[in-house]
Amino acid sequence: MTMVMFTKNREVKGLHQLFLDQIRDIYNAENQQIGAFPRFAEAALHSEYRTIVKKHFEQTKNHILRLEKIFENLGENPTDRECEAVNALIQKAHDIAEKNYGPRALEAALIAAVQYIEHYEIAGYGAVRSFARQLGDDESANLLQQTLNEEAHMDRLLSELAEYEVNSRAAEVSTRLFHA
């Protein structure tokens, strides 16, 4: 009986530490985006894309505040832990922006690059929300769910914009150039 109790306590401590490590990772990811998203918005011609990215930039500030609230509630500091994955995805987006795809294809590429970041965040927020629920931290779970909803909404907006406007315009230009 004692061995089972010891193992269970160790698992709870392990999940709690995993939760902290992962929200630190997400916290850094959000802060990296604060520096990157304005450049992503400026790089595109499509006004709706710029509007979506600028709105998400403002939401990202709220995501950071929610994470800081979670750290405060847990009595923890959001110590800097570099999110290497988002750092690499942001670098990939910068590399894409420097290629000579032409303006229409560049917009399609930028949307895809931002969606890579969004998908990483959706996975991360979904995981930490689940951890918070398992740890009985309903307040953190609710805050994380709010952000998860916003991230998913951003992804849907970008998908719709890409699918119904940007990608088709890029394809038209490519088709005209290819068949000319």
Q: Language-model segments: which ranges?
A:
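Amphipathic alpha-helical hairpins
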Residues: 1-180
